[in-house]
């Protein structure tokens, strides 16, 4: 995968990172433009193309538009059709990377940032009051009663709510956009990337969530609640 992608790069694109997941069963390569894009709302992104494939049959070969939020190193694909997916084929022993499809996907890196910037600006224009934010938090992470759960379940939900509210109120990765729908999505995206789950496996888990589409699903859920 790395060699196939490297052979297609032009002068404006470079390989940002590459690696293996699941004990070598999943491979990924991230290609990006050299310059960041700063939106009018002050949210800086770096457009990327993520190429992934698997050697264990767990994932299809996929080219997908994404972006990195520079302020927090979060991955996002907000505003992109099909969550940024531009090419996909089921992995098999006979499957090959078609150069035409790969070149088409790489061309979109140059324009992929426009849709994300447009969505960021749309979200930043939607006001969200503290009361509305609290309602959103309660909907996305409801605290169960002891009749429906045990004390551990109640505590986990309360801790999750507390962590997201702290991001909204005090964390510089979120506070510049607090009071807007952009701040809501950024708070949850940052929580999922940097606070949720065990710290020891965070880097690999975040990348696996990106290549598998889980990050997109988590963001879509927040977007749906905001509507």
What residue spans do the PLM features occupy?
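Short, well-structured alpha-helical interface segments that form or flank functional binding sites
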Residues: 3-4, 23-28, 46
């Amino acid at each position: 995968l790395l060699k196939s992608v490297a052979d297609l790069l032009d002068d404006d694109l470079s390989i940002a990172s590459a690696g293996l997941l699941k004990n070598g069963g999943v491979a990924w390569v991230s290609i990006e433009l050299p310059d960041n894009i700063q939106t009018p709302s002050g949210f800086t992104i770096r457009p990327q193309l993520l190429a992934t494939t698997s050697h264990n049959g767990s994932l299809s070969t996929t080219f997908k538009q994404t972006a990195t939020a520079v302020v927090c190193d979060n991955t996002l694909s907000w505003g992109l059709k099909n969550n940024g997916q531009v090419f996909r084929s089921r992995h098999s022993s006979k499957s090959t990377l078609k150069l035409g499809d790969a070149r088409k996907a790489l061309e979109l890196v140059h324009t992929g940032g426009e849709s994300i910037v447009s969505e960021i600006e749309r979200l930043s224009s939607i006001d969200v009051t503290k009361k509305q934010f609290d309602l959103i938090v309660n909907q996305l992470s409801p605290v169960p009663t002891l009749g429906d759960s045990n004390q551990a379940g109640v505590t986990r939900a309360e801790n999750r709510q507390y962590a997201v509210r702290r991001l909204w109120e005090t964390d510089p990765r979120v506070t510049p956009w607090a009071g807007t729908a952009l701040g809501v999505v950024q708070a949850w995206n940052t929580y999922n990337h940097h606070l949720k789950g065990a710290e020891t496996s965070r880097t690999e888990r975040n990348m696996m969530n990106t290549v598998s589409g889980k990050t997109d699903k988590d963001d879509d859920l927040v977007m749906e609640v905001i509507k």
